[in-house]
Amino acid sequence: MSAMENRKNSLHGSPNGLSGLNMVLPREGDSNNGIMTTEDARNGKLKGDKDLNMKMHVGMGTTPINTRLGNTMNSDVANSMSYLLEQPQSGTLIGDRLILETSEEPVGVNLVDGQNARNNQQMLNNASHMDPAFTLPADDTMNNSAAAAAAAAAAAAASTGPSQPTMQSTPSISTGGSTNFQVQIAQRLADIDQRILRMEMLMDNVCNKIDSHSQQQSLWKNDMHQMENKVIDVLDEIKSNIFSLKRQVSNQGDGAFAAELINAISNVSNKHIRKNTYGFPAGNPQGNDMGQTMNGYNNAMQLSSMAAPMSYVPGEQVNLNQLGNSKDQIDRFLTKSANEFMLDPSGLKKRRKNPSSSNESPITLSHTKTHSTSQPINYSASLPNLNLDALSKVMLPQHQQLTHNGGSQHPLSDKSIKFGISSTSHSSSNSSDSDDEEDDIDDEEDEAEDEEDENDDSRDVNDHDNVEGRETLTKKSMKPGNSIEGRDPSGTNGTVNSTTNNHMNTIDTATNTSSQLQGTVIRSTADTENPKQESNASAAATSGAATGVATGTTTANIATSASDKLKLHGDSKKEPKFTMIKAPSSVKEIWREYTQGIDGRPSIKSLDQKFGNKWRANKNKKTYSRRKRMYKFILNGIKKGKSEEEMVQMLENKRIYKDSDGNQKKRTIGWLQQSLSGI
């Protein structure tokens, strides 16, 4: 209960507006420890609550105090005290001093020693301060001893009667040294009371603020829970979207792989079909030329066989007739040479677009039954690997036997032409040539402009060699002194002349077809690379040897031409076959290999300057053509004024990229080479 509420029960009845009463009450104890207690009676109650009522303990002397005030007032009071009245209901505290509405100074009641007992009695009996018949109001909180003391004080005041003078109301005047001390204590207590009230108000404010903060925190907590739920929902939605995107990407990747697999299978099958095409399409000029050449050669062979006496070549004539008339033998050969189709697993790694593969003509065999019976069937034209070289190698031993054994009367043994074996061997060689041609097609697609320059150089060399070979063959075939007559040392002119006449009948026919044969050989060797040039050159030398035999050339000329070719081949072997590094880790390593060389090997730049394009092995051509793009890129930058390090770093920076997670990675050297394809 606050002090303002306590003031509502304070006593009233003083004409000066005093609303409180200071009462001196005895307390049990010995004479040495007698304690006088002053209770705050502003609310008319005597309580023991020290928190709500001010209490002051003052020593009043050594003489025991009786319960009657009259005896005390006579001579037992040894010290005088001045008690401040409590703050009235209508007053205020200014400067820790009590100020009433009718007075500017605090009002007090003086209690003096025994000499002024009369004045004290008059003060107690004065009606202006307290009525002798006054009794404290009954209250449940008042203890019995306090009520008895109050009643005793009232009775003592009434018993004195009017004989004692009336005590006048005077201002508080202290007559002893302890009075100021007690006044200061009272002022301090009032100040403490005021501060306690202020502290109570501050505590109330603090409690209110704490309550408001707790409510605000509860609201914030609810908001945080709602926000957390929203964030969780958004994260779940994002995860579901990412999962769906990954599923779509995986599905697309599977579809793309299936499409690439189908394309690879189609490319491999088309390559197999091209390798096993046995007929010559009508739109292929090379095939038409080869067919005409083979027809002329067959006609020449027929004329030579008809001109030769049957007595000398009984077995050969039978075999030639069997070769020309046995269709079943050629069918068996074609069936045997047609390999079973098998999917090449390496074809998946060589995926490339071939739009023209779908427009290829169907497989046609020229030995079908569409030929007329009146015309001779040229079965050799339908053979895929049968060429002039094979026929010359097969027919050469028999003609040599005819020329060497012309004077003898011993019958020749029946030796059939091993057509299947020789053609099969050439089939394997030509199939490897066709494989090389397919690889060359792939190389040309990747090498672009670089391989075109190399092919131009190789064509120039091939043309020069073929022209020389053609002139040599023509000169040898046209020499009039190269006859078989000089070969016969025995002097049997009749036999020698007959043999010479028989073979001379075929010279004109062979001469007429020589230009066609030479043109075919030149065209076949013009579009191939160095290894094929050597094989075609050897084939041309062999065909020249066959022509020389037919026209009567000596074996010395054949040996000379063969030795020339072997010498040329030996010179080519002296050229270094350099192997480039595989799987380089950086552009800097590739450029160092080009300019300086790696591991003590010569640089690629020096090899190009010294040997041209002949230092590279076949497996290095494709690698060199791709890396040459980077060489050109760096060299072009150097021409524009930039340094080698800047150009190399530019290519390295081009490889850098970021993946879907933001991690920095590098693409491969192959990707970088492919990106520079336009250079």
From Swiss-Prot:
Compositional bias of kind Low complexity: 422-432, 490-502, 535-546
Alphabetical keyword list: Activator, Nucleus, Transcription, Transcription regulation
Record field: compositional bias (Polar residues): 355-379, 402-411, 503-528
Compositional bias segments (type: Basic and acidic residues): 39-49, 458-474
Chief site of localization: nucleus
Stated family: Belongs to the HOT1 family.
Name under which the protein is recorded: High-osmolarity-induced transcription protein 1
Lineage of source species: Eukaryota, Fungi, Dikarya, Ascomycota, Saccharomycotina
